[in-house]
């Protein structure tokens, strides 16, 4: 073989390798790299709002806010630019206001371990609840039937309630009665935001597919706002550095090569975060702030949904 032919052959081989390597760096933007999903179901959960003596750590007040089977709608969109990488945006929102419950406990006597004051508000409305989650998954292990990897993302969750009417028992039962029916007593909002890390996995056998996700954060920031309407007082708290644990289990069946019906369960737990509190008198405009661990915020919730996923 002539020298020129050998050189030409080598150049052709190297050129082909370079083109192959270059093509691997180009993200896949074809329709089949995109997946969308929608589902509907129910949200339930419970939040706690606490107030402490910042110097002694003694609990002074606790409000328990419940969420009872509120209807939600979920949406999810994923893009696989490479076989080893998935970009995802997902979220859910309440479809309408829903049912809740609130119990308010106070410990006004520091020498008494049991609460002294309690009010109950069965006619509590969940005004709204929603969440969004932006994340990326890197698939470290892959085969025809499974893949496993790591994930990182940012998540924000909000809840809002209004308690109306109800009954009360104050000073160890010395004063009892009822609040006027339908009258607003307390309104409460919570917001949690955080970056997170986690593990992700997927397994498929024939037309059945199982997905699992575990999320963890040590960097939760929480905010709340409490409106005591009958006292014209506003309480605001901020906390940071608390923990979050979450899991998502998704099981589905492919009714066509591109369409999957699925059911999904999610569980989220925001551990109590402690921080300072601010009290605002809405009549006078006066404000008092207390630092340290004067307040606490926590939540745990779960969703159960069913829906349809489609890959283009």
Curated annotation (Swiss-Prot):
One of its GO terms (biological process) is proteolysis. It is found in: Cell outer membrane. The active site is at residues 104, 106, 226, 228. Gene3D superfamilies: OMPT-like. Disruption phenotype: 90% survival of infected mice, mice develop a robust immune defense. Its EC number is 3.4.23.48. It catalyses: Converts human Glu-plasminogen to plasmin by cleaving the 560-Arg-|-Val-561 peptide bond that is also hydrolyzed by the mammalian u-plasminogen activator and t-plasminogen activator. Also cleaves arginyl bonds in other proteins. Pfam families: Omptin. Keywords: Aspartyl protease, Cell outer membrane, Hydrolase, Membrane, Plasmid, Protease, Signal, Transmembrane, Transmembrane beta strand, Virulence. Forms a narrow, elliptical 10-stranded beta barrel with the active site pairs on the extracellular surface. In the mammalian host activates (cleaves) plasminogen to generate the serine protease plasmin. Plasmin degrades fibrin clots (fibrinolysis) and facilitates bacterial cell migration, enabling rapid dissemination of bacteria from the initial site of infection. Cleaves host plasminogen to generate plasmin and probably also has autocatalytic activity. Fibrinolytic activity prevails at 37 degrees Celsius whereas coagulase expression predominates at lower temperatures (28 degrees Celsius). Cleaves plasminogen; plasminogen cleavage is much higher than coagulase activity. This is Plasminogen activator.
């Amino acid at each position: 073989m002539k020298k020129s032919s050998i050189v030409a052959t080598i150049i052709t081989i190297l050129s082909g390798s370079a083109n192959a390597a270059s093509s691997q760096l180009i993200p896949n933007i074809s329709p089949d790299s995109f997946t969308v999903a929608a589902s509907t179901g129910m949200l339930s959960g419970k939040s706690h709002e606490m107030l402490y003596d910042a110097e002694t750590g003694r609990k002074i007040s606790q409000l328990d806010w419940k969420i009872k089977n509120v209807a939600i709608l979920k949406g999810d969109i994923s893009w696989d630019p490479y076989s080893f990488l998935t970009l995802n945006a997902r979220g859910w929102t309440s479809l309408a206001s829903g049912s809740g419950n609130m119990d308010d406990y106070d410990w006004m006597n520091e020498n008494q371990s049991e609460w002294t004051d309690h009010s109950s508000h069965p006619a509590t409305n969940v005004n709204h609840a929603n969440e969004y989650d932006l994340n990326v998954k890197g698939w470290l292990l892959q085969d025809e039937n499974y893949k496993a990897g790591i994930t990182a993302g940012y998540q924000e969750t909000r809840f809002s309630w209004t308690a109306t009417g109800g009954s009360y028992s104050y000073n160890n039962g010395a004063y009892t009665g009822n609040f006027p029916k339908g009258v607003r007593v307390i309104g409460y909002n919570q917001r949690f935001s955080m970056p997170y890390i986690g593990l992700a996995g997927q397994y498929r056998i024939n037309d059945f597919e199982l997905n699992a996700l575990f999320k963890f954060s040590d960097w939760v920031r929480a905010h709340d706002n409490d409106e005591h309407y009958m006292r014209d007082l506003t309480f605001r708290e901020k906390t940071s550095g608390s923990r979050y644990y979450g899991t998502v289990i998704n099981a589905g069946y492919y009714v066509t090569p591109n369409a999957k019906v699925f059911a999904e369960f999610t569980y989220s737990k925001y551990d109590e975060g402690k921080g300072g509190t601010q009290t605002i008198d809405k009549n006078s405009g006066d404000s008092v702030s207390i630092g340290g661990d004067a307040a606490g915020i926590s939540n745990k919730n779960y969703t159960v949904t069913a829906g349809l996923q489609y890959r283009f």
